[in-house]
Amino acid sequence: MFTIDFSDHTGLVKDAWYKQIEDLLEFAKKEEHIEDDAELSVTFVDKQEIQEINRTYRDKDKVTDVISFALEEDEPEIDFSGLDIPRVLGDIIICTDVAQEQANNYGHSFERELGFLALHGFLHLLGYDHMTEADEKEMFGRQDTILNAYGLTRD
């Protein structure tokens, strides 16, 4: 079973946001051929908290829109086959304040921006990155393909 553990540190998250992200990431999981027995967490925070996380864990003292912590990122390959435990992908942290600002700046809905950020974080958990131009092209192309196939367009 694909499990997403949500946490709202803002007190402002609407139930519809949980449903949207859950449905989108379930769709993305299938598109990326991730096994059903996987889990991750999504946490909603404000600007102050995401800046603190960014400073503490990434040594960047600034506000950002989304941060991902992939559990498998720096770990050597561990074979869990045959064990009845889910694959833990990691954590996605989304700043809802920045999501709203970016939606306004880009001229699309908050829901589209929230979906974009959740998917962006999810792809990072799967190993996608945008440190090089080629990696960025691959990751952003994949994001656009999944968002468009899901029906969450820039319009």
Swiss-Prot record:
One of its GO terms (biological process) is rRNA processing. One of its GO terms (cellular component) is cytoplasm. Keywords: Cytoplasm, Endonuclease, Hydrolase, Metal-binding, Nuclease, Ribosome biogenesis, rRNA processing, Zinc. InterPro entries: MetalPrtase_cat_dom_sf_prd, YbeY, YbeY_CS. It comes from Staphylococcus aureus (strain Mu50 / ATCC 700699). Single strand-specific metallo-endoribonuclease involved in late-stage 70S ribosome quality control and in maturation of the 3' terminus of the 16S rRNA. Disulfide bonds: none annotated. NCBIfam families: rRNA maturation RNase YbeY (TIGR00043). Belongs to the endoribonuclease YbeY family. Zn(2+) binds at residues 120, 124, 130. Its cofactor is Zn(2+). This is Endoribonuclease YbeY. Its EC number is 3.1.-.-. Binds 1 zinc ion. It is an enzyme of class 3 (hydrolase). It is found in: Cytoplasm. HAMAP family: Endoribonucl_YbeY (MF_00009). GO terms for molecular function: metalloendopeptidase activity; RNA endonuclease activity; zinc ion binding. SUPFAM superfamilies: Metalloproteases ('zincins'), catalytic domain.
